[in-house]
């Protein structure tokens, strides 16, 4: 892999915001909580984004929804909201920023899940571009930070309108767009269409963030060559592997790619994440959610099946500590 041919580059502009680096952590419901975002930011993510939060829930001051907006302690962090009513989205955006102090506001027009699109939210907005543009315009007027939009390639293979929608939201005041190279109907199946992302890049003058199928440093380099994108949003590839950000950043700059640390160090990072989660959500919820995260940290580790089974019944921080000690003792 020869990232040097792509030139030395390490920053991008998001409106008036200077971003050092080009990797973004994708907003993912049930995954990108404050603890995981803090870990990813510390290990090299240039930008992190909160889990998506309902605009209606924010307007009604729902405490659980409000708790999702906690900003990372460092780095650039955006708050993502979803909804389909311009006035409600504007009010929610202003409140989200007041509550979180986020560096930018992201509008979700990409979530493909039925419970979201059936309400006209998420990727359903790709079928109503005029409404989508009105939402962006209303939110831009309501906040003083850059506004970005997360979208997909389109609704289905017969309506791949990301380039057209990107132009509309740019005209409405968006400072950047992130594009997942799959349609709504594809969900996460098949292969991300990076050529569709290139079409968006060629249609707008604002930064374009490429999303979909970036699982390695080599993927990031290939994605940049294929799309010409300004930034690269990492999603499922980061599960249990927050070191992917530093690897991608190095590859994109043509530098030597750092190796993943040994298992003992990876376990220590997992423990740090779970401590942060307990601080943020309390021990009970943190331990329930640690089950999936801890299993992800052990992906690809030989002979880890025994510990993965034990992880599935974690209920206390003491359980986590005991399992971590066993892993460090028995596995490599």
Stretches with model-predicted labels:
Residues 12-23, 56-76, 111-121, 140-148, ...:
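N-terminal small/glycine-rich loop or linker at the start of catalytic domains
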Residues 28-30, 53-55, 82-84, 110-112, ...:
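Active-site beta-loop-alpha junctions enriched in small/polar residues
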Residues 2-15, 19-23, 29, 34-35, ...:
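Alpha/beta catalytic cores of nucleotide-metabolism and tRNA/nucleoside-modifying enzymes
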Residues 90-121, 129-206:
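Alpha/beta enzyme core
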Residues 6-13, 28-103:
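Glycine-rich, positively charged N-terminal anion/phosphate-binding segment
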Residues 126:
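Aromatic- and acidic-residue-enriched carbohydrate-binding clefts of CAZyme catalytic domains
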